Each structure stands twice: as structure tokens, then as C-alpha cells.
Design a protein with these regions (language model features):
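C-terminal coupling/interaction segments
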Residues: 258-296
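ABC transporter nucleotide-binding domain
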Residues: 170-258
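Solvent-exposed beta-strand sheet faces enriched in polar/charged residues
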Residues: 10, 229, 249, 278-280
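Short, flexible helix/strand-to-coil boundary loops that buttress conserved ligand/catalytic motifs
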Residues: 92, 221, 241, 267, ...
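ABC transporter nucleotide-binding domains
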Residues: 4-7, 14-185, 190-204, 210
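A generic structural signal for alpha->beta connector loops
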Residues: 108, 180, 243, 271-274
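Alpha-helix C-terminal capping segments
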Residues: 65, 70-71, 98-105, 118-120, ...
Length: 296
């Protein structure tokens, strides 16, 4: 295990019947980082987390957690976990759940500290079973962090949350990293990864396609985003071979293209009234699309 890594999968294979979930996956979470794991549905993200946590065993390859087997109690006591599917006793109040889970850890946060950090104090005395779906996710997050974890696993934590609740969770995650926690986060929200991640890992069909900073991931793709005001129609521009897609945003067209220089030349040659022309590098969304296409 790399000395800077807290959790690591090495050449891990996992099948469920005839379905290949992981196909030689190598993945690690480094000390002090927030790692965002991206991938389409069925890419193997949840399976990878489950093996790192010792909930599943790999068919081939190895998993380590704090340099130990994931099944070791000493390793597990340094974790916080929030999976996609969570069952908690519906009759217990949120504060009671936090206190119960905190009692398993050697140096936990108090229930009040956990709720303060996650802004869930208004849920403290409510039975878990009476909460909405989004409120349950917020309560699960408070429970996941109450043990003051060195490593926090969050599997699609913001699904079902409104924008304000998502931003509250983002703020809490930044605070946890500042306090010394490392975090593995899976998400479908690319802006979440772009905003939070120190490093991004892209998984498709059970394989690691690439990993790096957001800027490094963007550099993998040749696409650029062009915005302009033009008299040309969407249909005219979409017909150009370098153009992947075109959309209108208020008075401007937004064009995603390979070979942006050729598209700019065409625009200038075709429309004397062209205005507000700007060219931007690809965002994480374009990079993600291109990288996962390679696995198709």
C-alpha cells in the first residue's frame, strides 16, 4: 500500500453471475484529499466502495484499508460511511441515532457538534421514519460523520436533496477536509465534483479510465465550448462536421465542438454580424462524456 493512501484496490475483479462489475480496477484514496468517483450507472462505483469497506470480497485482486484488511475492526473504527441504501430504526429520533452510532467510536463528536456541522438541529427530535427522503439523507450524513472519521465514504450523498441542502452538505465536506478527514465521494452531479474534488477518478465498465485533478481530466479532451450571437440557425451550425451539439441560451448560441478553430473560421466567414464570440475549454461534463465513450 502507498504510504499516502488510506484505502486501495489493486487489480480487483468482481462478477455477479455473468455480469462483470469490476474488471481489474485500481483505485486509491490518498491522505487529506477529497476524491470524486464518477461513472455512468452500472460502472461499478458502489461495488468498489463495498469491497473497500469489506462488505464484499473481490474475486481477484486485493483491498486494503489503513494498511490492513478491510475486515479489521481497528480499520473500521476510523471510517464514516453513507451508502445509497440505508435502513435505520424508524421510531428512534435523529439525535438518538447519532448518539447510538457515536458510542461505537473512541473519540466521537457530540450529537450537538454533528448536527451543528451538518445543519440538522431542526431534525434532532423527529423520529427518523417521519422524515422526508431528503431529510433522511441529511440525517444519514450527520450519523456518518459523528465518529470523527479519518476516512469518509459517501455514495451519491446528495441525491434527493434540494439545492440549499446540497450546498450545506458541500460546505460541511470542505470543513471536514480542513479538519483532516479524507473523503471518497461518488456523484452524478458533475458540478459537485468540479466544485469539491481535489482529484477525480472516472470509472466505466468496472475499469479506471483515468484519474487526476479536474484540470488534468479536462486536458484529455479536445472539445471546446463556443458562445456567440449569430444570425446563423442552430440547424446550419449543427451540420458542420466539427460540431457535436448546439443549443440556444437567451440571445446566444452555445456550441460544443472538436476543432474549435475551424468552427470559429466558419462562423466569421458565414456571418458578418457575428458578435460576442468567446471560446472556452471543455468542462468536466464534456471530458466525462468522451472518457466514458472509450469504454463503450
Amino acid at each position: 500500500m502507498n504510504n499516502g493512501s488510506l484505502a486501495e484496490l489493486t487489480n480487483v475483479h468482481k462478477r455477479f453471475g455473468k455480469t462483470v462489475a469490476l474488471d481489474g480496477l485500481n483505485l486509491q484514496v490518498d491522505r487529506g484529499e477529497l476524491l470524486a468517483v464518477l461513472g455512468p450507472n452500472g460502472a461499478g462505483k458502489t461495488t468498489a466502495i463495498s469491497i473497500m469497506l469489506g462488505l464484499l470480497k473481490p474475486d481477484e485482486g486485493s483491498a486494503s484499508l489503513f494498511g490492513q484488511s478491510p475486515q479489521e475492526c481497528a480499520a473500521r473504527r476510523q471510517l464514516g460511511v453513507m451508502m445509497q441504501e440505508v435502513y435505520l430504526a424508524p421510531e428512534l429520533r435523529v439525535r438518538e441515532h447519532i448518539k447510538l452510532v457515536a458510542s461505537y467510536y473512541p473519540d466521537p463528536l457530540s450529537a450537538e457538534e454533528a448536527m451543528e456541522l451538518t445543519q440538522t438541529k431542526t431534525l434532532a427530535n423527529r423520529p427518523y421514519g417521519k422524515l422526508s427522503g431528503g431529510q433522511k439523507r441529511q440525517a444519514q450524513f450527520a450519523i456518518a460523520i459523528c465518529g470523527r472519521p479519518k476516512l469518509l465514504f459517501l455514495d451519491e450523498p446528495t441525491v434527493g436533496l434540494d439545492l440549499q441542502a446540497r450546498e450545506t452538505m458541500w460546505s460541511a465536506l470542505r470543513s471536514l477536509v480542513d479538519r483532516g478527514s479524507s473523503i471518497l465521494l461518488t456523484t452524478h452531479y458533475l458540478e459537485e465534483a468540479e466544485s469539491l474534488a481535489d482529484r477525480v477518478a472516472v470509472i466505466a465498465k468496472g475499469r479506471l479510465m483515468t484519474s487526476g485533478t479536474v484540470n488534468e481530466i479536462r486536458a484529455f479532451v479536445s472539445r471546446k465550448r463556443i458562445t456567440c450571437r449569430t444570425a446563423l440557425s442552430i440547424e446550419q451550425i449543427q451540420a458542420w462536421p466539427e460540431v457535436e451539439r448546439v443549443a440556444r441560451h437567451q440571445q446566444h448560441l452555445q456550441i460544443v465542438a472538436n476543432g474549435a478553430e475551424d468552427v470559429v473560421r466558419r462562423l466569421l466567414a458565414s456571418d458578418e454580424t457575428l458578435e460576442d464570440l468567446e471560446v472556452h475549454r471543455a468542462g468536466l461534463a464534456e471530458a466525462f462524456t468522451e472518457l466514458t465513450k472509450e469504454a463503450a
